[in-house]
Amino acid sequence: ETSLQQWRFSHDKLREQALHSLSSEERIELHACIAQSIEKIYPGDAGRASQLALHYREAQQLTKAAHFYGEAGEVALRRGAPGEAAVLLEQARTLHSQVAQPRLAEIRVWRGLTEANFGLGRLREAESALRHLCMLGGIPLPTQSAHLLSMIARVGASLMGSRVGLF
């Protein structure tokens, strides 16, 4: 249906068909336009970060997509959704390997991956992310498992304590 020169799709299949009828260049341009519109209408709204990430990725603007996937992952962590955060931060990490990003952005992604994996009980993945994070920060980690697990537990307790307002 149309209203004031705008399309509104009442069924997913109609929307999918309309998207498939576009050329790849038109889809890229449409996604870029949508992302720019979201940023203009909702400036600084971190709750829109996952939408922006998706549209910038589809618009092949990978630097912006990586930024917004990282931001969306941090938002998910703050909401207490480590599973969602892990998926979003993994997208950011993948894009960081394709486009140059500031070291601080990489550190934030790896910190988030450490926290998300720890929150999900994925201790091996949390350890791996923590090792990478510390490597980026120039801080060596202990190599013995007992010392490392103790360190991870302390960091995890500190993170959880800060979430509930104990620290």
Model segments located where?
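N-terminal alpha-helical targeting/anchoring segments
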Residues: 74-97, 107-117, 121-122
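Hydrophobic or amphipathic alpha-helical targeting/insertion segments
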Residues: 103-160
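Short secondary-structure boundary elements
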Residues: 1-84, 94-96, 136, 140, ...
